[in-house]
């Protein structure tokens, strides 16, 4: 029996996923499962480009505003939530659409998860303190000695991934790259096949321009004030996944007095471009990928046509 197809609308940041999602919802009885590790947080709306109240009124949306910024959320939890929601949406006679750009979540849903050790808050605090003294490039050099394969694919300033790789080395007693080559953990195989409608730019420079324009629009909409509200909370700090989100960590550094606003803006745009590059690298390796030029004037119409072809009769 052929597994039931689940449609994923994916693409790099600023590719226009939200506009396409709303157009699809006008044609089919959809419910959206958001695949985004930032929009899960309450009070983080501007910098995450979270759907507005008006947009949410047009189509049911799941996995938005489900965590306080002080709380954690994992790929394993997303997988469990998404599989539950897919079944519930099917039971209502509606169509689930996975939409977003957190590629680790898609990977977890499709393939299950590797048996890696859980995060250790004390160890993370120790690594962050060392990074504050020495800089992340120094910790990247340390990682290169412990796990050369992982270090080779990470930027010396990729703080989140360097921290996680060092954490795994310490907790597991072996490199993350070795663990990733080992046995998968006991997740049941996904009962579905996944078809990815992939919004990708035909010109990188044009996407970069979009990213800069969008970041400036977020600043104009009040991003600094949004982050200021988070910054005032004593329970939030730069080590949390919420604060490490692109845009938020740069504004946090500005509010800490470490950099000026122009530098924070430049760093935020650069970090968003790097995120888009990683997203595109992952997308290009996906099976059953239908490419749609997100820069085309009729990109939304093309997405609707691709959805019509991808859905089972």
Swiss-Prot record:
What family is reported?
Belongs to the IPP transferase family.
Q: What domain of life does the UniProt record list for this protein's source?
A: Bacteria
PANTHER family under this entry? Answer: TRNA DIMETHYLALLYLTRANSFERASE
Organism of origin is Bordetella parapertussis (strain 12822 / ATCC BAA-587 / NCTC 13253)
Q: Which Pfam families match?
A: IPPT
Instruction: Name the residues annotated as site: Interaction with substrate tRNA.
Output: 102, 124
Which GO terms are recorded in the biological process aspect for this UniProt protein? tRNA modification
Q: What class of enzyme is it?
A: transferase
| Gene Ontology terms for molecular function | ATP binding; tRNA dimethylallyltransferase activity
**Subunit-structure text:** Monomer.
Keyword Cytoplasm assigned to the entry: answer is no
Q: Which cofactor does it need?
A: Mg(2+)
Q: What is this protein called?
A: tRNA dimethylallyltransferase
Residues recorded as binding ATP, renumbered to this chain, are 11-18
**Upper taxonomic lineage:** Bacteria, Pseudomonadati, Pseudomonadota, Betaproteobacteria, Burkholderiales
Q: Which InterPro entries match?
A: Dimethylallyltransferase (IPR039657), IPT (IPR018022), P-loop_NTPase (IPR027417)
What is the documented function of this protein? Catalyzes the transfer of a dimethylallyl group onto the adenine at position 37 in tRNAs that read codons beginning with uridine, leading to the formation of N6-(dimethylallyl)adenosine (i(6)A).
The reactions it catalyses are: adenosine(37) in tRNA + dimethylallyl diphosphate = N(6)-dimethylallyladenosine(37) in tRNA + diphosphate
Q: Where does substrate bind?
A: 13-18
- Keyword terms of this UniProt record: ATP-binding, Magnesium, Nucleotide-binding, Transferase, tRNA processing
User: Which EC number applies?
Assistant: 2.5.1.75
The segments labelled Interaction with substrate tRNA in the record are: 36-39, 160-164, 244-249
């Amino acid at each position: 029996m052929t597994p039931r197809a689940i449609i994923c609308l994916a693409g790099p940041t600023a590719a226009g996923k939200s506009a396409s999602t709303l157009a699809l919802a006008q044609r089919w009885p959809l419910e959206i499962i958001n695949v985004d590790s930032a929009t899960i947080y309450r009070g983080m709306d501007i910098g995450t480009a979270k759907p507005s109240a008006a947009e949410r009124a047009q189509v049911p949306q799941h996995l938005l505003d489900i965590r306080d910024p002080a709380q954690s959320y994992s790929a394993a939890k997303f997988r469990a939530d998404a599989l539950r929601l897919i079944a519930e949406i099917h039971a209502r006679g509606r169509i689930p659409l996975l939409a977003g750009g957190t590629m680790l979540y898609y990977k977890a849903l499709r393939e299950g998860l590797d048996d890696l050790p859980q995060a250790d808050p004390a160890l993370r605090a120790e690594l962050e303190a060392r990074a504050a003294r020495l800089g992340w490039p120094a910790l990247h050099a340390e990682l290169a000695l412990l796990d050369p394969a992982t270090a080779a694919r990470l930027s010396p300033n990729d703080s989140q991934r360097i921290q996680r790789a060092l954490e795994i080395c310490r907790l597991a007693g072996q490199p993350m790259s070795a663990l990733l080559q080992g046995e998968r953990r006991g997740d049941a195989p996904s009962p579905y096949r996944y078809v990815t409608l992939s919004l990708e730019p035909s010109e990188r420079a044009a996407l970069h321009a979009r990213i800069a324009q969008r970041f400036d629009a977020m600043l104009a909409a009040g991003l600094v004030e949004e982050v200021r509200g988070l910054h005032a909370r004593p329970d939030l700090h730069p080590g949390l996944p919420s604060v490490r989100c692109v845009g938020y960590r740069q504004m946090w550094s500005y509010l800490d007095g470490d950099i000026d606003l122009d530098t924070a803006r430049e760093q935020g745009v650069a970090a968003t471009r790097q995120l888009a590059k990683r997203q595109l690298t992952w997308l290009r390796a996906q099976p059953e990928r239908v490419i749609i030029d997100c820069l085309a004037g009729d990109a939304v119409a093309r997405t609707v046509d691709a959805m019509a072809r991808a859905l089972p009769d």
